[in-house]
Amino acid sequence: MTLARYKRTTAGLVASCLLPWLVSCAPPRLDEPVIGAKNFTEQVVLGELLAQEIEARAHLKVERRFYLAGSYIAQQSMLAGRIDMYVEYTGTALTAILKKPPLHLADAAQNEAASLAEVTKLYQQRFQIAAMQPLGFENTFAMIVRPDETASGPGLGMAGVDTLSEAVGKAQNWRLGVGYEFEERPDGLRGLEKAYGLHFKGEPRTMDLGLLYRALASHQVDIIAGNSTDGPIAAEHLKVLADDRHYFPPYQAVPLVREAALKRWPQLRGVFAELAGKVTANDMRAMNEAVDGEHKDVAVVVRGFRAAHGL
């Protein structure tokens, strides 16, 4: 076991032991909807979008509990009644929470529909949590490179590579950078390597997601596992290699809401219906970049999006 993996394993064990204490020791909640979000920019933006829409349309005061440390903490907070809702991604819900294998239907639309149906059914049966209609975009994993061989350095053979299949036989010269979660997840690195027969140069460099793009720009790595709605992709004109074998499952952004909360505040359903299909992948990239790249306040960015879309 490498030192990095030992640290991650130890951290995971500590987090597992502390989780009940962390959830139970959260501050007591008030009689108002509590909105959660995981600890990265897109999640905070989406949490703020839910909050502003509920305040404006349902005329309810809401509590924001953002920066939860990952899907597992968010899910446990839902089950404990510490939060009432947050936005999750269908592929993450299916594989990381429900522990189901990804669906790999040949037709992309059927795959999206089947994954959403499975998540909707099992969340209701197991957790009494309702999956609302998708917001309109998915945030899948994305294998990202600098846009041309010149920028990538000599001898890497990236010119003309547009898909992951075309990377086979060349990637052994590429240094890979990944986030901690991607290396360990069932729908992450090891499965990707197996699905395509990919081999990279040496061990992957693991780091916080926010550092991946810096490492790519400074030539510390040659390819990274990012997210398809990351702001730097468009802002820095980076190239996403197409997942032409459809390895990654759909990751539609879907609000998850405790059924108890929907019974307590039935007007919430109208809010989620109004948001359905309103956020495109380009919208999400632009908001992420506005916060991360332009250092704008999340609430201001969300208000601008709502105004531009008549929300």
What are these regions (language model features)?
Residues 50-58, 149-150, 157, 165-201, ...:
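Ligand-binding cleft/hinge of the Venus flytrap
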Residues 30-42, 60-66, 172-177:
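Short, well-ordered beta-strand elements
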